[in-house]
């Protein structure tokens, strides 16, 4: 039995731990048949019909590790936290009004400090640095980036050249950081990307396509490609600079993308989940029309977690078969009503 711990970022500045259990982790890839030499005197036997593959069972959702939401040491600051990441033995969370906080154990957190005064939307750890991206949340004002090597001391935020909007997501791959977002101008929205090899110096924003009212909400790297998504569209790049035309996948809004189990996994409104192995063909794997949006995805230790903003989560071991949405509860069994913003794996 394999178990991973997951750390959820809550809008109301509380924190939750949940564990996801993968019951069937011993599946082996199907081995190709080995041809045998024909016997000279015996007639050939007819081919046997192929046997259907054993269906994959989604991970169990009955092993929840709960904490008391009201514990004073789990209330951090007085502003909303938007994103969290883990790196170099530390958890770092970022949020509204430029605030950041750090913890080495997920329980005891540093006093929140302001790094600039903007909204930090996303953070990642790669290449020896924590790098956070965000903006003002208002049209006509620039997007910003900051970085830290220890999660405590932060560089003065710098603006992204030519980008008057917000950066919503950041990833690292192929030797560079890639951040995506949008630029509002004259009441129109344009999709933009900026890249950096060191997290310090950033390229001028690159526009992707023309105005379609589409924002780029999330970006991931896998199988040699960057893939950015938003508002039901996807675009791809091998170098983070030249991007494909926007492809319509769905009329649902998209909020998060990851690469796991040899495929890209996308989630969004109406609890929708799509997968693709080639970024050409996309298959819908889950949906519940009229329900809350899935806003974050996580892959760790063989388990995939999809998180709803309203406190529900889904689990999968392959990205194809998913458990039914389950509610996060506190240690007394009461449903958690705080709104969630993100999720992070714990070692």
Name each model-derived stretch.
Residues 2, 28, 39-42, 48-51, ...:
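Short, low-complexity interaction segments enriched in Ser/Thr/Pro/Gly
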Residues 5-6, 24, 78:
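Generic extreme N-terminus detector
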Residues 59-347:
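Residue-level hotspots at or immediately adjacent to binding/recognition sites across diverse folds
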Residues 14-69:
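Bacterial Sec-dependent N-terminal signal peptides
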Residues 1-18:
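Sec-dependent bacterial lipoprotein signal peptides
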């Amino acid at each position: 039995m394999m178990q991973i711990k997951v750390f959820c970022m809550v809008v109301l500045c509380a924190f939750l731990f949940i564990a996801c259990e993968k019951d069937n982790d011993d599946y082996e890839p199907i081995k190709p048949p080995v041809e045998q030499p024909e016997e000279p005197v015996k007639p050939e036997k007819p081919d046997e019909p192929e046997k259907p593959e054993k269906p994959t069972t989604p991970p169990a959702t009955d092993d929840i590790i709960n904490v008391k939401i009201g514990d004073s040491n789990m209330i951090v600051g007085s502003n909303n936290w938007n994103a969290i990441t883990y790196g170099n033995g530390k958890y770092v969370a970022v949020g509204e009004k430029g605030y950041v906080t750090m913890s080495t154990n997920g329980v005891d957190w540093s006093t929140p400090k302001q790094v600039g005064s903007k909204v930090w939307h996303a953070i990642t750890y790669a290449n020896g640095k924590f790098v956070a991206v965000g903006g003002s949340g208002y049209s006509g004002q620039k997007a910003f980036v900051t970085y830290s090597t220890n999660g405590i001391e932060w560089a003065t935020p710098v603006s992204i050249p030519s980008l008057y909007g917000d950066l919503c997501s950041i990833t690292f791959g192929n030797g560079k950081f890639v951040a995506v977002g949008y630029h509002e101008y004259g009441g129109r929205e344009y999709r933009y990307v900026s890249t950096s090899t060191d997290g310090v110096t950033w390229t001028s924003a690159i526009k992707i396509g023309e105005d379609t009212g589409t924002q780029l909400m999330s970006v991931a790297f896998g199988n040699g490609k960057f893939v950015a998504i938003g508002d039901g569209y996807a675009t791809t790049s091998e170098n983070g600079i030249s991007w494909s035309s926007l492809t319509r996948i769905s009329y649902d809004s998209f909020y998060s993308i990851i690469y796991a189990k040899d495929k890209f996994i996308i989630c969004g409104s109406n609890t929708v989940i799509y997968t693709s192995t080639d970024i050409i063909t996309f298959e819908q794997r889950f949906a519940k029309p009229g329900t809350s949006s899935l806003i974050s995805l996580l892959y760790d230790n063989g388990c995939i977690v999809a998180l709803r903003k309203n406190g529900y989560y889904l689990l999968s071991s392959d990205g194809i078969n998913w458990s039914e949405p389950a509610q996060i509860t506190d240690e007394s069994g009461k449903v958690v009503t705080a709104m969630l913003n993100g999720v992070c794996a714990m070692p």
